[in-house]
């Protein structure tokens, strides 16, 4: 957990060579792509940073010949309908994939992670409290706002450079935020709502690295896209440790029935987090007017139902093992390897 009690210099270096300015994500001052993303995030960054030299902006880094997203992350990719698409339509679907990925990330931050942090600061959970925790959680909330802006910027770059709207209004709420809301709607007591959000947020904050890893180190997609995700990813390793400790402390302070309830919500959150978002992709191909999409969508759902887009479940597996409750939950861990 970061120590936020000491005064920080405006630009501070880390042992790994990354620089953190204020609340911005840590970045490599020698990496042009990372500098460009940070520069986009805060317009006057180059006047404040320790390294003051001209760096390319995000638009200069854009390569029209590179895909915006990973083709193998599109559910329709393995269906014959994909082979019948024109190169132009495939390219548009890959751009949509990046925009939808960003929107899902933003919705997770705004509707699940930050609401849980707000509940912590508001004293909703037993076993939690104290200045150090409040400072760490408040800083995490600031981080999440930067992450939100980074991903909104990421979509904005794609829209400008591809000269197309790719409007978020075309997209439904993401799968995990929809499932989270469904669980909230079934709650009858305030404690149920707060524990539901904690369960889903714990999954999101601990498993988000696995989701971001899907693009962070990809060498084929747009450099600015993978770099945006990479910068976000670094902060989330810290958030994972904070969320894991909060989960342990709250669980220990709960009576048996509420412990069971919380574990049920962790499993529900994990199932929603790792699943492919069929509804979003159906909305995309419908909007794009892909011929035969309805039949293809039904076949894809049947073939891929129960599969996991995010294959790495090790974060939650490790947490539940440390809590000595792994045998109390039912989840298809597959070949999960603990870290």
Swiss-Prot record:
Q: What are the protein's UniProt keywords?
A: Antibiotic biosynthesis, Iron, Metal-binding, Oxidoreductase
Q: Name the residues that bind Fe cation 2.
A: 144, 205, 236, 239
Per UniProt, the cofactor note for this protein states:
Contains a nonheme dinuclear iron cluster that stabilizes a peroxo intermediate.
Disulfide topology: none
Chain residue ranges for the region called Disordered: 1-22
The protein's GO terms of the molecular function aspect are: metal ion binding; oxidoreductase activity
Q: Which GO terms describe its biological process?
A: antibiotic biosynthetic process
Q: Function of this protein? A: Involved in chloramphenicol biosynthesis. Catalyzes the six-electron oxidation of an aryl-amine precursor of chloramphenicol (NH2-CAM) to yield the aryl-nitro group of chloramphenicol (CAM). During catalysis, upon exposure of the diferrous cluster to O(2), ClmI forms an exceptionally long-lived peroxo intermediate (CmlI-peroxo), which reacts with NH2-CAM to form CAM.
In Swiss-Prot or TrEMBL terms, this protein is called Alpha-N-dichloroacetyl-p-aminophenylserinol N-oxygenase
Question: Which species is the source of this protein?
Answer: Streptomyces venezuelae (strain ATCC 10712 / CBS 650.69 / DSM 40230 / JCM 4526 / NBRC 13096 / PD 04745)
